[in-house]
Amino acid sequence: MLAKLERLIGEIGDLNSKLILLVGPSRSGKTQLLRQLGAKLNIEPLNVGLELGRRLAATPNNKRGFSAGELLREIALLEQFGERTEAPLLLDNFELLFEPSLQINPLDLVRRLAHSKRVVAVWPGELRGDRLVYADMSHPEHRDYSRDGVVVLEI
């Protein structure tokens, strides 16, 4: 599976969105695969929930939604600072982005990061047909997106 992921990373360089989502059931090995890739490339995967949560905690409630995207871009820039520019950005644990009070589109935010840099991210939901789904329909954090413009690697 690691070899397949590495091949995909090499193939997405010319795409408009250079985003690969690792998708699979809970405990299927998505995070483990991301860590294996990180170890091979000597890159530490970014724990988005931890890093972004720290910064949002210092942001007033009424500005968090507006700030979340900018803070994520800042964190991503800091993460790649000093790294080889061709190295992909590895993202994990970005469930915080689905918080309804932020009123943001998590997939769009991650897609925007992937316009200029390859991004490999663990999708915290599942793939249903051609739809990326996060949480059940009855859950306040429920989201349903088309997988258009995203390379999906099913685990």
Language model feature labels by segment:
Residues 14-22:
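Pre-Walker A (Motif I) flank of P-loop NTPase domains
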Residues 33, 37:
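Hydrophobic positions on the alpha1 helix immediately C-terminal to the Walker A/P-loop
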Residues 1-13:
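N-terminal pre-Walker A segment at the start of P-loop NTPase domains
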Residues 38-46:
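Post-Walker A helix-loop "phosphate-sensing" segment adjacent to the P-loop in P-loop NTPases
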Residues 50-80:
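Short glycine-rich substrate-engagement loop in P-loop NTPases that contacts/grips substrate
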Residues 29:
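Conserved glycine(s) of the Walker
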Residues 25-26:
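P-loop (Walker A) phosphate-binding loop of NTP-binding proteins
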